[in-house]
């Protein structure tokens, strides 16, 4: 998503061989991007920052090689703006013509280019505009004004069974069950189905936070997000979390439902529609459902390589895993809504932050003076 249009754009094809390397020096990076001028760049890079730098370096277009083996091209997003752009962000809505190609096609082009210079022609049709979309939210009141926000995105690529139709169905069942038991709720439960997750860079949840900020800031005690649930081959679970509840909270639940206790958690990312940092929601959790290391089929964030492709179909659903994911998330949100005090463990949280800060500081060059940082933290 997000590309300039191109109508038979012609140019010399240039292979970005340094995209296979890591830890490039500043001089290597400088020479690398200078080589892109007036070229159609074939690369393994796919991030928006890279495409932006390629555009600033004078590249004509970018062709991203999908790293996944097989007949896959994962729909992705090179936009750098979170949500609907403001006027001062308009400059970042200018893009190069950019498209993805299959791994086999990319490797074939690399092989041909080794024999000599090649020209390429690129045609891309793209419509970029602000659209009106609908978002459904169910507000099930509890005995207090505080509530747990539970969410998932309903926009999908193609059929999108595991991303994110299964989660949407689970949320619908939550709404049915919780509404039937609404008289028993200590805190309310608000269930939201976001639009604009992929194509709008979390524009739905961003709009919701902007439009409901005061309520979220005052009353929302937790945000639990469901994404990629019920996916075949996703036998293990790791918690993505902001960490305020302490690792044992999610580890206990994960061990109960999988038999394996994780010894780490993954810091929260924006991909879980985490548009609520500024509203200071105390607890933020999205469980991550993964294959066992020996059964991993790809680097995709799901059970297999079908993520964001037309192959994310009903046969990728595992009903047993779906029920596991529905139960663990329901137990978590029910525990939070019914707790006398929300399960925030500040001593453990600060201990974890201390360890992460020390690890970061220990990796810095000795020329970087950390005295003031350490004094402030201590």
What do these predicted ranges mean?
Residues 1-27, 85-162, 172-186:
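Soluble metallo-hydrolase cores and metallopeptidase-like ectodomains found primarily
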Residues 106, 143-145, 195-306, 376-378:
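Metal-dependent peptidase/peptidase-like ectodomains
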Residues 13-16, 40-43, 61-65, 97-101, ...:
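Structural recognition of the beta-strand scaffold that forms the well-ordered cores
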Residues 187-190, 293-354:
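His/Asp/Glu-rich mid-to-C-terminal helical/loop segments that flank catalytic regions of hydrolases
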Residues 177-202, 226:
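Short helix-loop-beta-strand segments that form the rim/entrance of peptidase-like active sites
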Residues 1-97, 262:
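Extracellular/luminal Protease-associated
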Residues 344-378:
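Acidic, Ser/Thr-rich low-complexity intrinsically disordered segments
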Residues 1-3, 15, 38-45, 50-51, ...:
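Second-shell loop/turn segments in exported
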């Amino acid at each position: 998503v997000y590309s300039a249009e191109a109508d038979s754009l012609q140019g010399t094809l240039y292979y970005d061989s340094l995209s296979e390397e890591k830890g490039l020096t500043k001089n290597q990076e400088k020479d690398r991007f200078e080589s892109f001028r007036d070229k159609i760049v074939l690369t393994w890079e796919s991030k928006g920052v890279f495409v932006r730098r390629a555009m600033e370096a004078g590249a004509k277009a970018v062709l991203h090689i999908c790293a996944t083996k097989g007949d896959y091209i994962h729909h992705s997003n090179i936009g750098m703006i979170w949500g609907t752009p403001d006027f001062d962000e308009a400059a970042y809505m200018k893009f190069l013509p950019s498209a993805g190609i299959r791994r086999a096609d990319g490797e074939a082009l690399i092989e041909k280019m080794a024999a000599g210079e090649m020209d390429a022609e690129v045609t891309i049709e793209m419509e970029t505009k602000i659209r009106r979309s609908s978002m459904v939210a169910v507000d099930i009141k509890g005995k207090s004004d505080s509530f747990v926000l539970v969410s998932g995105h309903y926009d999908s690529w193609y059929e999108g069974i595991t991303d994110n139709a299964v989660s949407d169905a689970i949320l619908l069942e939550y709404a049915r069950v919780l509404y039937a038991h609404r008289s028993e709720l200590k805190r309310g439960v608000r269930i939201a189905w976001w639009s604009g997750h992929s194509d709008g860079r979390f524009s739905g949840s961003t709009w919701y936070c902007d439009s409901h900020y005061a309520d979220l800031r005052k009353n929302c005690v937790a945000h639990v997000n469901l994404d990629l649930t019920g996916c075949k081959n996703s036998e293990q679970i790791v918690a993505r979390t902001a960490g305020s509840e302490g690792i044992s909270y999610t580890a206990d639940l994960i061990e109960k439902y999988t038999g394996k206790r994780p010894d780490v958690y993954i810091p929260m990312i924006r991909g879980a529609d985490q548009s609520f940092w500024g509203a200071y929601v105390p607890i933020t959790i999205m469980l991550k459902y993964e294959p066992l290391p020996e059964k991993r089929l790809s680097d995709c964030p799901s059970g297999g390589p079908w993520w964001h492709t037309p192959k994310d179909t009903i046969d990728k659903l595992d009903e047993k895993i779906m029920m596991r994911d529905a139960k663990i998330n329901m137990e978590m949100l029910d525990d939070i809504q019914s707790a006398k005090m929300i399960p925030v463990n500040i001593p453990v949280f600060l201990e974890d932050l201390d360890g992460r800060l020390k690890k970061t500081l220990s990796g810095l060059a000795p020329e970087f003076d950390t005295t003031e940082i350490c004094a402030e933290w201590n």
